[in-house]
From Swiss-Prot:
This is Nitrate reductase [NAD(P)H]. Its EC number is 1.7.1.2. The gene is NAR. It comes from the Eukaryota. Nitrate reductase is a key enzyme involved in the first step of nitrate assimilation in plants, fungi and bacteria. The keyword Glycosyltransferase does not apply. PANTHER family: NADH-CYTOCHROME B5 REDUCTASE, NITRATE REDUCTASE. It comes from Zea mays. Keywords: FAD, Flavoprotein, Heme, Iron, Metal-binding, Molybdenum, NAD, NADP, Nitrate assimilation, Oxidoreductase.
Length: 231
């Protein structure tokens, strides 16, 4: 058995021929980087006619859901130019970077390189004392695939991880976090201000990143060229 060998902060492409056309989607493994013999992907299935915005559903996710146990798939990687090498150190486009604090903004239903980085920091504690501040946004709390793991496994292990959830739709039961959209006010309240020892890790819809997140971070003192890494 072998290790996948995927550096922390990078992802793989799953490739398949669907309807006679090549389809590729990027996924971040949820299993530890040193896992031997297998790796895990957490994928939400977007079924046809489930969401009026996407009447055909997810092409790749439905294809994967249709595969029988024991089927094979093609993957390629690693992909992305950002890697977390541990204990506050990043490699970005081949250059070493250092961060005492991470300001993480994550929106969407999938798992991301942000999750991978968080797990790597937690695995190295107490040697890795990186502070992590996460704003995690989604339509509903049920769409936050890793929320249960964050609440039950990650948060109890460290005081260096601070999390603020934001949902578009208020849950039926009690909800003690944010409702609405991620904006500059939310970012200022739950993320550290920019300085030479803070890096922002951003993953989400392009429109949100360009229209809200990047302008907000710039007003908070972040150097967008050096301290804002978009996955």
């Amino acid at each position: 058995p072998q290790k996948l060998g995927l550096p922390v902060g990078r992802h793989v492409y799953v490739c398949a021929s669907i309807g006679g056309k090549l389809c590729m989607r990027a996924y971040t493994p949820t299993s530890p980087v040193d896992e031997v013999g297998h790796f895990d992907l957490l994928i939400k299935i977007y079924f046809k006619d489930e969401d009026p915005k996407y009447p055909n559903g997810g092409l790749m996710s439905q294809y994967l859901d249709s595969l029988p146990l024991g089927a094979t798939i093609d993957i390629k990687g690693p992909h992305r130019h950002i890697e977390y090498t541990g204990r506050r150190r990043f490699v970005v486009n081949g250059k070493q970077r250092h961060a005492r604090r991470l300001a993480m903004i994550q929106a969407g239903r999938g798992t991301t390189p942000d999750d991978d980085t968080e797990q790597a920091v937690l695995r190295d504690q107490p040697d890795d004392d990186t502070e992590m501040h996460l704003v995690y946004a989604n339509r509903t709390d049920h769409d936050m695939l890793l929320r249960e793991e964050i609440d039950r496994a990650w948060l109890p292990r460290t005081r260096r991880l601070k999390v603020w959830y934001v949902v578009s739709k208020v849950p039926e039961d009690g909800w003690e976090y944010g409702v609405g959209r991620v904006d500059e006010h939310v970012m200022r309240e739950h993320l550290p201000l920019g300085d030479s020892e803070t890096i922002a890790l951003v993953c989400g819809p392009p429109a949100m990143i360009e229209c809200t997140v990047r302008p907000g971070l710039e007003k908070m003192g972040y150097d967008l060229d050096k301290a804002c890494l978009v996955f």
